[in-house]
Amino acid sequence: MLRIYQRKLEVFIRKNKRMANIYVVFQHIGYKRHPSIKNKLIIDEQVKDIVEKIFDMYANGQGSVEIVNFLNTNKYLSPTGYRKTGIIQDENKTNYDWNEVTLCNMLKNEVYIGNTVQNKKSVVSYKVHKIRTVEKENQIIVNNTHEPIVDKDTFEKVQCILKKRGTNTKLKYDYLLRGL
């Protein structure tokens, strides 16, 4: 019974997402929820400059380690720290440091060019609770749902640099004892 209810709910939510009824669950750094319109993002002017600076620095050839060091030495809180405290810069910062994974996830996120991407991950079963990443073609991408912070040219340039600098995690050869 619960499985049937879960499937119906999943179908309903996917249908609404495809019809551009976007559900804003996660608030990205640089954006905040609109005070009166449900499920709409507006630019957070307090943080907009930091997001633009991060994309510009990466597009101009600075690496993720350099940018993370810049953000941490200037006492900028990470997205988690900003969400929890509501401030972007803290002189007494003891927690919420930036790291390369957070930065790279931010640089890959299409929300900064005005698109909303949903259905990135799904739960395999309500019993098992394993989460798997959904292929790009099965994700729900709705263009121009909110005002962009970064222009598309800068975003595309950053994506090209990320692809060039990306590491290859595939095995170059099979290990003899693999799978035993």
Where are these predicted regions, by residue range?
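Conserved catalytic breakage-reunion loop centered on the nucleophilic residue
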Residues: 1-180
